[in-house]
Curated annotation (Swiss-Prot):
Lineage, opening ranks: Bacteria, Pseudomonadati, Pseudomonadota, Gammaproteobacteria, Pasteurellales
Domain of life of the native organism: Bacteria
Annotated consequence of substituting residue 333 to S: In strain: RM 7004
Catalytic activity: UDP-alpha-D-glucose = UDP-alpha-D-galactose
Record protein name field: UDP-glucose 4-epimerase
Biochemical pathway: Carbohydrate metabolism; galactose metabolism
Biological source species: Haemophilus influenzae (strain ATCC 51907 / DSM 11121 / KW20 / Rd)
Class of enzymatic activity (EC top level): isomerase
This protein's encoding gene: galE
Length: 338
């Protein structure tokens, strides 16, 4: 039996495909390549010595989904596909709702028709909005989202919650993760944003390699220890392992299951700059600029439920995150376009 990974050519998706192939799973990838590259899957093959079957296309394409379910014996879906930039979502809300919400609805409907009942959803800490309690536990209030990206994730969570109640065959696992960083230690796959990066670590590493002149630090007047935003940064390989653990724990385990995937530690933007400089012996030029719309001051997790129920704990620390980020960037200065 195979696992369908939507968005499997993307940053988190490709790292998860590596973990699945490494434990002998058969993997089918669907990706429209709007913010990813097919080269990532070639690199996955280099790392694992195994190949994922690839379909280029969109989760909104019912006919293609029907073809995939007909041609492959799929028993589980891990759903990464979607648009993911907070700032862009404020400018393009309808695109985000169409891709992230309508796309997931189509996928769930076609899974049901095909009799595929195991679903792992790539959600986000943004569903917590501006959190009232830190660290954030899974039972903290959701829905007070501050941008359309977060709202789209929250809406999908509600759809999954209602679907799990209405259709008892479904095993729905929601993984709310915090800020993925780093890259595979081989340096073969990593985060490869189009244009100016929206995420911090690619931005820092592109300054380090000389691709960008300096880092823009969005907001220096937050109520944090140094005025810059505090986040829970998690190594992408730890995150990928979390998906595998969730799949193994809840395969054919009907109902709704929700977990935070994070380290439980918060670091500011300037903490991250200093950590990168220290780990890689490089100076990063930066400037303090205005806050970015939709951003909040502080967000980090309590990941103890995942430890208790999934046996999952983030193992890779800040230094490893920085070293692996730089190893990927210096070996691939233009990302997958090299």
């Amino acid at each position: 039996m195979a696992i369908l990974v939507t968005g499997g050519a993307g940053y988190i998706g490709s790292h998860t495909v590596v973990e699945l192939l490494n434990v002998g799973k058969e993997v089918v990838v669907l990706d429209n390549l709007c913010n990813s590259s097919p080269k990532s899957l070639e690199r996955v093959k280099q790392i694992t010595g195994k190949e994922a079957k690839f379909y280029e296309g969109d989760i909104l394409d019912r006919a293609l989904l029907q073809k995939i379910f007909a041609e492959n014996e799929i028993n589980s879906v891990i759903h990464f596909a979607g648009l993911k930039a907070v700032g862009e979502s404020v400018q393009k809300p309808t695109e985000y709702y169409m891709n992230n919400v309508a796309g997931t609805l189509v996928l769930i409907q076609e899974m049901k028709k095909a009799g595929v009942w195991n679903f792992v959803f790539s959600s986000s800490a943004t569903v917590y909005g501006d959190p009232k309690i830190i660290p954030i536990t899974e039972d903290c209030e959701v829905g007070g989202t501050t941008n359309p990206y977060g709202t789209s994730k929250y809406m999908v969570e509600q759809i999954l919650r209602d679907t799990a109640k209405a259709e008892p065959k479904f095993s729905m696992t929601i993984l709310r993760y915090f800020n993925p960083v780093g890259a595979h230690e081989s340096g073969l796959i990593g985060e490869d944003p189009n244009g100016i990066p929206n995420n911090l670590l690619p931005y820092i590493s592109q300054v380090a390699i000389g691709k960008l002149a300096q880092l823009s630090v969005f907001g220096s007047d937050y109520d944090t220890h140094d005025g810059t935003g505090v986040r829970d940064y998690i190594h992408v390989v730890d995150l990928a392992v979390g998906h595998l653990k969730a799949l193994q724990r809840h395969e054919n385990d009907a109902g709704l299951h929700i977990y935070n995937l994070g380290t439980g530690h918060g670091y500011s933007v300037l903490d991250m700059v200093k950590a990168f400089e220290k780990a890689n012996n490089i100076t990063i030029a930066y400037k303090l600029v205005e806050r970015r719309s939709g951003d909040i001051a502080t967000c980090y997790s309590d990941p103890s439920l995942a430890a208790k129920e999934l046996g999952w704990v983030a193992e890779r620390g800040l230094e490893k995150m920085m070293q692996d980020t730089w190893n990927w960037q210096k070996n691939n200065p233009k990302g997958y376009r090299d």
